[in-house]
Amino acid sequence: MVRVRIRSPSWYDGVDNAPHRVYLRAVGFTEEDFSKPLVGVAVSWSELGPCNYHTLELARYVKEGVKEAGGAALAAPTIVVNDGINMGTPGMRYSLISRELIADSIEAQFNAHGVDAWVGIGGCDKTQPGIIMAMVRLNLPSVYLYGGSAEAGWLGERELTVEDVFEAVGAYYAGRITLEELKRVEELSFPTYGTCQGMFTANTMALLAEAMGVSLLGSATPPATSARRRKFAVESGKAAVRALELGIKPRDVVTYDALYNAAVALFATAGSTNAILHLLAIAHEAGVKFALEDFDKIGKRVPVIAALRPAGPYAMQDLDRVGGVPRLLKKLYKAGLLRGEALTVEGEPIGKLLERWEPPAVPEAGVLYDVDRPYKPHGGIRILWGNLAPRGAVMKIGAAEVLKFEGKALVFDGEAEAFKAVAAGEVKPGHVVVIRYEGPKGAPGMPEMLKVTAAIVGAGLGESVALVTDGRFSGATRGIMVGHVAPEAAAGGPIALVENGDRIVIDGEAGLLKLDVSDEELERRRRQWTPPPPKYKGGLLAKYAALVSQADQGAVTTPETCQC
């Protein structure tokens, strides 16, 4: 039986630590338990939405696996901010911030209590990168477990996801559907607990965790309601103890090659643009140099081979049915696009795991494609550069039918006013909606713009109106949408200088984001521009705004970026 204990003896062994042991005896520890490795279980649990509603149950299965492998497990909670509920509200400012809070809270709890290894259970969007950031920060043997996607809904023969509800709102305001039809979509689109069903941010990050090797192969796609989800919970508990025994730590796994593989998987699935922000943050925590330029190079080599929403018609449960992430990764590996030598938490390189893995005898049925005959020839996301984004911006070209667009700027200093303009019919074909002061510092918190983007698409303007912002997008976003513009407006980026009527050029093929205004005119505007005062003078949002870096740096909170 495993008895590797790398930290817990300093907390719990010997006469001097008798007062420490008494607290664990009070919660059920036996004398034998104190000789076992102490394995923490970080549970992001909440009843504020379906995404993490069931994670306490999964934690019990993880603890079973730890016990079977010879460890002693104790669970501790961390927070959840449900992006879908706070979309388009002041609450969205807390979404990205929660990623940092989750990483910080896990660091505090597990460093304070001397755990030897741990398992992190995530669900909703920011819980996953927050947990993985904590993994590489603590660098203790650890495994990530995804809570799983909700099942898709159905309206007749039409498969529904939460994306349909957001777009139905825009369709209602445009007079394309009735209130009764909107209500029907609302009632049917989310029938179970679990995360949003398409290749949106939560499912994207789960897929990338598997591609990075920090979670077990095959564990991303089983639905939240599936018995296989519980099986993976047990196996994840065992894997954490095994990683402790083998001495495998997250920084052995999260290397440049692992991040490279994650980026390949991201582009191949046209996943959420949020993943770029999160992978940059994970790289920062791991001490790995991985920048927007790396994404730019990788994205030009990788086609989209998964027809998953919002880029295609299928949901996560459909990918699971045809073999899940392993089938996707094996296609990429056989095509020479993955770095097979990257180590995984299972103790073997990902290439060896994929070579052994055999796909189910199920046709791919249009869900997955081959690399040489892809679903879309270009990668799902393109990095844009230009005088409007000197430090880069991102465009989800896999979910856009129009890759090149030129139009006149319609400028809003915030998302709320932009949504009102769309709902009132003031946004017309040929407009480039510019939403600024919604970046990491400016909002603060870099909120997602799904309410506006879905309203644009729902109004039938998805191919005739573009949107450019220093904020973020939901993984459910589609259309001509450019986000993460850096530097942001609040930091004096060129987006702060855009005026109504300015011509903006977007070229998703060439990777260009250009403001068609002379350098002399921009300099004149800059001399007249003054930075806005902080929106908050106290509390969490004020602290975050003072610490956070720009989007091209992952929007991490570090002493180096502190404006204290």
Swiss-Prot record:
A Pfam family of this chain: ILV_EDD_C
Lineage: superkingdom: Archaea
SUPFAM superfamilies per the UniProt record, alphabetical: IlvD/EDD N-terminal domain-like, LeuD/IlvD-like
Cofactor binding, per record: Binds 1 [2Fe-2S] cluster per subunit. This cluster acts as a Lewis acid cofactor.
GO biological process annotation, one example: isoleucine biosynthetic process
Modified sites of kind N6-carboxylysine: 126
Pathway: Amino-acid biosynthesis; L-isoleucine biosynthesis; L-isoleucine from 2-oxobutanoate: step 3/4; Amino-acid biosynthesis; L-valine biosynthesis; L-valine from pyruvate: step 3/4
Enzyme active site: 474 (proton acceptor)
GO MF assignments: 2 iron, 2 sulfur cluster binding; dihydroxy-acid dehydratase activity; magnesium ion binding
Binding site for Mg(2+): 83, 125-126, 448
Chain's role: Functions in the biosynthesis of branched-chain amino acids. Catalyzes the dehydration of (2R,3R)-2,3-dihydroxy-3-methylpentanoate (2,3-dihydroxy-3-methylvalerate) into 2-oxo-3-methylpentanoate (2-oxo-3-methylvalerate) and of (2R)-2,3-dihydroxy-3-methylbutanoate (2,3-dihydroxyisovalerate) into 2-oxo-3-methylbutanoate (2-oxoisovalerate), the penultimate precursor to L-isoleucine and L-valine, respectively.
Protein family membership: Belongs to the IlvD/Edd family.
Record's subunit section: Homodimer.
Protein name: Dihydroxy-acid dehydratase
Lineage: Archaea, Thermoproteota, Thermoprotei, Thermoproteales, Thermoproteaceae
Name of the gene this protein is made from: ilvD
